[in-house]
Amino acid sequence: TLVSMSDEEFPREYCGWWRIIESSLWGSADIDIAGPALISMTGYDDRLRMFVLLAYLKCNPTKAGVSFTWQGAWEYDPVSGTGSVRLRKDGCISGRIKIKNGEESTFVAKRTAEPDEPIPDPPSYRDKWRQRW
């Protein structure tokens, strides 16, 4: 788990849960294939779920918004990367997510409530092989 900072240091306008509603590279048809596409930004134990990506985030405020590093799994493949978000005039956030040595996409998210079910931990290859036997 990546841990960021105390709640007092995290900008209130970004703090909370956000529902990802658009993605430039991967489209929007399958955005919820692993469950509702979400990003949490609180400065502590933050998560990302989009398509088949499950990841832990480490968020840091910047002058322009919030930047983050992340690590997790794309299906069962370990992946990591970076990203950033900025608040728009309409109250949504615009973001960018980049997979290390891979693709990059922009996204749009709107504020939402914390999900009833937590975002699961990213799976590992061990989990993949357990399911086959």
Q: What positions do the PLM features span?
A:
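Edge beta-strand at a domain terminus
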Residues: 2-14, 19-23, 62, 90-92, ...
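N-terminal glycine/threonine-rich, aromatic-flanked beta-hairpin/loop signature
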Residues: 8, 17-20, 28-65
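Short beta-turn/strand-loop junction motif enriched in small, turn-promoting residues
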Residues: 23-26, 73
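Short, surface-exposed coil-to-beta transition loops
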Residues: 33-36, 53-56, 78-82, 102-106
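A short, hydrophobic secondary-structure junction motif
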Residues: 37-49, 89-92, 128-133
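Short beta-strand segments that buttress and anchor functional surface loops
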Residues: 47-52, 67-74, 95-98
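Mid-chain, well-packed structural core segment of small domains
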Residues: 59-89
